[in-house]
Amino acid sequence: LPVMRPLVLEYEKDINTHNMNDEFMIGSQLLAAPVVEQGATKRMVYLPSGEWVDYWTKEHIAGGQYIIRDAPLDTCPIYVKAGTILPKYPVEAYIGTKEQKKLILEVYAGDGEYEHYQDDGLDFAYEQGAYNLYRFSHTGNGELEEKLLHEGYPKYEEIEIKYIP
């Protein structure tokens, strides 16, 4: 599946997603609802079933409904599925300035699992096994379990965990 995809690919049984063309999924855990109407100050957003978290405000919202969201020019409405483990890297001037030594994981309340791939991003050394594959999982108890499924590359020096209640 493509990284950016229509909601219907994730929620094919939900008839509300069948003709939706102004919201999309980023992977299976993030929903983006960009403002597409000029001059709009509010945006109607459909959230499929399940629990969602507003990425910006961290407000929990029940899915299976339409909501009205303020739509300032500088903020795209983004919603995170409960239980998501969202990977991030520290802010850089531009990508590729240095090797990534720190991984930041935002862990959203609920049960979830995430596989993370790490290599140098520069060559084909991964074909000879020069990569790491991690599996992170958690349940509602707030504990994050890390398993290294494949080790063939220097591990992160630091993995910072940020719990999002």
Regions found by a protein language model. Name each.
Residues L1-I164:
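Catalytic core of carbohydrate-active enzymes
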